[in-house]
Amino acid sequence: MDYGILGSSDLDQCSKLAAKLQTNLLLPLIYPLIRDGQFKSRFLQKRLEKCSAEKGDYVRAFMAMFGAARPYVTMQSCKNQFYSDLITPLPEGIDVPGTEIHIFYALKMGAKYRARYQQHFAHPVIHEQDLQHEELLACYPYKWAQLVKSIAEQRV
C-alpha cells in the first residue's frame, strides 16, 4: 500500500469497561438518528435544530453526508461498530516501509488530535485545514477529492 489517508479521525481508544459504558449510554440516544434520520428525544432533536441554525451549512452538510434514515441498520450492528472502534488497539509509531500516511487535520478539532496522529504514526503527512471535524468532506467534497487525487498522483 503506497498511501493511507485519514480524514480528521479522532482515533479514540479506551478500556473495555469504558467502551461498554459509553456504548450503552450513548447508543440508545444516537441510534434513532441513524435509523430514522432524527433523534427520538425531543431535547436532542431541538439541540440539533438549534446547532444547525447556529452553525448553518456545516451541520446541514454533515447531516446530509451522514444521510437520511437507514431503517436497515440494526442497533446491534451500530453497537458492534461503536464498541469495537473504541477498544481496537492502535499501536504507537506505526511505520510501514513504502507507505505514506496522510491525515486531513481539522484544526478546529483541537491540538490533542495532532498529538494523537503524531503518537500513532511515525511520519504522518499532516494536511492542516482551518475547519471542523469532517467539514472538508461534508462541505467541500470537490476540494477533498482534489487533495486525495494530488496525494495519489505523487508517485505516478
At which residue positions do the language-model features occur?
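Conserved serine/cysteine hydrolase catalytic core
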Residues: 73-119, 136-137
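Conserved alpha/beta-hydrolase catalytic His-Asp/Glu region
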Residues: 34-94
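Flexible "cap/lid" loop of the alpha/beta hydrolase fold
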Residues: 2-34
